[in-house]
UniProtKB/Swiss-Prot annotation:
PROSITE patterns: RIBOSOMAL_S14
A GO biological process held by the record: translation
Entries under HAMAP family matching the protein: Ribosomal_uS14_1 (MF_00537)
NCBIfam families recorded: PRK08881.1
Name under which the protein is recorded: Small ribosomal subunit protein uS14
Complex formation: Part of the 30S ribosomal subunit. Contacts proteins S3 and S10.
Function text: Binds 16S rRNA, required for the assembly of 30S particles and may also be responsible for determining the conformation of the 16S rRNA at the A site.
Protein keywords: Ribonucleoprotein, Ribosomal protein, RNA-binding, rRNA-binding
InterPro entries membership: Ribosomal_uS14, Ribosomal_uS14_bac/plastid, Ribosomal_uS14_CS
Example GO molecular function: structural constituent of ribosome
Source organism of this protein record: Brucella canis (strain ATCC 23365 / NCTC 10854 / RM-666)
Keyword Ribosomal protein: yes
Gene Ontology cellular component terms for the protein in this record: cytoplasm; small ribosomal subunit
Family as reported in the entry's similarity comment: Belongs to the universal ribosomal protein uS14 family.
């Protein structure tokens, strides 16, 4: 089980990303628009830098929904390889069967 503080920190980051997503996207569009004057683009860059660091999507770490483990994460199932193996062997994940050949 991962530290609860790390899991909670990641959840806080996810909330910040949702809260600032529209503003961040709008500022990024201004910065990337070559047709706008350089001063306006520079002001948008400064305002983008003033946003909280944790409001950037790249700061979010994919974590297992079951254990909070950050590594060995399967995006499709939102869980780690270890949790997948445990729940799969117990038959709690639909469509997952033990392989034999």
């Amino acid at each position: 089980m991962a530290k609860t503080s790390a899991v909670e920190k990641n959840k806080r980051r996810e909330k910040l990303v949702k809260r600032h997503a529209v503003k961040r996207a709008r500022l990024k569009a201004i910065v990337m628009d070559q047709g706008l004057p350089l001063e306006e683009r520079f002001r948008a860059t400064i305002r983008l830098a003033e946003l909280p660091r944790n409001s950037a999507k790249v700061r979010i770490r994919n974590r297992c929904e079951v254990s909070g483990r950050p590594r060995g994460y399967y995006r499709k199932l939102k869980m780690s390889r270890i949790a997948l193996r445990q729940l799969g062997s117990l038959g709690q994940i639909p469509g997952v069967v033990k392989s034999s050949w």
